[in-house]
UniProtKB/Swiss-Prot annotation:
Main location: cytoplasm
Quaternary structure and interacting proteins, as annotated: Forms a cyclic heterotetrameric complex composed of two molecules of XerC and two molecules of XerD.
Chain ranges of the Core-binding (CB) domain: 1-85
Disulfide bonds: none
Record's function text: Site-specific tyrosine recombinase, which acts by catalyzing the cutting and rejoining of the recombining DNA molecules. The XerC-XerD complex is essential to convert dimers of the bacterial chromosome into monomers to permit their segregation at cell division. It also contributes to the segregational stability of plasmids.
Name this protein carries in UniProt: Tyrosine recombinase XerC
One Gene Ontology molecular-function label: tyrosine-based site-specific recombinase activity
One cellular-component annotation, GO: cytoplasm
Length: 295
C-alpha cells in the first residue's frame, strides 16, 4: 500500500503541482484511511470494496468527523482510486458509487463594513504593522484565498494599475483588481520590506526574511483582530467572505464576483446570494410597515 502512496505523492507534487499545504492534507487523510484498513486486517488497495469505503466513512464519523470533513475524506479517497485505475493497479474505483453524508448548509461568516473600517483604522509606523496592514487590505480588497496570498511574489503585484496575478485552484491563473487603499498599503510595505532581509521574491516575508507561512498569516490576523477590538475571531476566509458579500450587496453581479473569487462553478458563488438575501430580509423586516413583527 505504501508503494502506491509514494508514487501518488510524486504524481501530486510533480505532475499536478499541488501546493505543499494541499499535499499535506492529502497525506493526512490517506494515512488515516490506511490505519483504519490495517486495524481491520485489510492490507491492499485491491481488497477495498464499496462497502469497505462506507465502513471507512462510518469509522471516521465515530472518530468525530462531521459531514464536511467526511465529504473531504471521501473526495480524497475517490481521487486516489481514480489514480490507481489510471495506473492499472485496480480495475474499478470502489468509491465512485458511494455518497458523502448530506451536509447542512452553513452560511459563511463575514464582518460588516463598519467592522472593516475599525479593523483597518491603524496608522502604526512599525514595519511589522505596515506589513500586516498590507495583507489585510489586499485580502479584503481582492478576496484572495489564504494560499493565493501566501504564494504571491514581488512580480505578482502591480500597484500602478492595481492588479494582482494569482495562481488559483487547479493551477488556473487569473488577474484580480484591488483598490487604492490596498495599493497604498502595499507600496508602504514595499518601502520597508528590505528591513526584513528577504531571502527570496516572496511578497510577504517574516522578520527572519522567509516567506510567511499559512499559519503565520492566520496568527497575525488573529492578533490584529484582537488589537483592533473586533468582537469576533478574524481569519483570512472571513475577509474573503466579507469581500464577496459586500461586492454583491453593492453590484448584484454574481458572474463578476465568481470571476473575482476564482470559482469554477457558479453554484459555489451562489451561497453569497443567500447572505445577500438575508441582509435584504433584515432591511425589509425593519423598514416595511406591514412586515414589522409583533413584540
Amino acid at each position: 500500500m505504501q508503494e502506491q502512496l509514494d508514487k501518488y505523492w510524486n504524481y501530486l507534487r510533480i505532475e499536478r503541482q499541488v501546493s505543499p499545504h494541499t499535499l499535506t492534507n492529502y497525506q493526512r487523510q490517506l494515512y488515516r484511511i490506511v490505519d483504519i484498513l490495517a486495524e481491520n486486517g485489510i492490507t491492499s488497495w485491491q481488497a477495498v470494496t464499496p462497502s469497505i469505503v462506507r465502513f471507512i466513512l462510518a469509522q471516521s464519523n465515530k472518530d468525530g468527523l462531521k459531514e464536511r470533513s467526511l465529504a473531504l475524506r471521501l473526495s480524497v479517497l475517490r481521487r486516489f482510486f481514480t489514480y490507481l485505475v489510471q495506473q492499472q493497479d485496480i480495475n474499478v474505483n470502489p468509491a465512485t458509487g458511494v455518497s458523502a453524508p448530506k451536509q447542512n448548509r452553513h452560511l459563511p461568516k463575514n464582518i460588516d463594513a463598519e467592522q472593516v473600517q475599525q479593523l483597518l483604522n491603524n496608522d502604526s509606523k512599525e514595519p511589522i504593522d505596515i506589513r500586516d496592514r498590507a495583507i489585510l487590505e489586499l485580502l479584503y480588497s481582492s478576496g484572495l484565498r489564504l494560499s493565493e496570498l501566501q504564494s504571491l511574489n514581488l512580480n505578482s503585484i502591480n500597484t500602478r494599475v492595481r492588479e494582482v496575478r494569482v495562481m488559483g485552484k487547479g493551477n488556473k491563473e487569473r488577474i484580480v483588481p484591488f483598490g487604492r487603499y490596498a495599493s497604498h498599503a502595499i507600496q508602504q510595505w514595499l518601502k520597508v520590506r528590505i528591513l526584513f532581509n528577504p531571502k527570496d521574491e516572496a511578497l510577504f516575508v517574516s522578520q527572519l526574511g522567509n516567506r510567511l507561512t499559512h499559519r503565520a498569516i492566520q496568527q497575525r490576523l488573529e492578533v490584529w483582530g484582537i488589537k483592533q477590538g473586533l468582537s469576533s475571531h478574524l481569519n483570512p476566509h472571513k475577509l474573503r467572505h466579507s469581500f464577496a458579500t459586500h461586492m454583491l450587496e453593492a453590484s448584484s453581479d454574481l458572474r463578476a464576483v465568481q470571476e473575482l473569487l476564482g470559482h469554477s462553478n457558479l453554484s459555489t458563488t451562489q451561497i453569497y446570494t443567500h447572505l445577500n438575501f438575508q441582509h435584504l430580509a433584515e432591511v425589509y423586516d425593519s423598514a416595511h410597515p406591514r412586515a414589522k413583527r409583533k413584540k
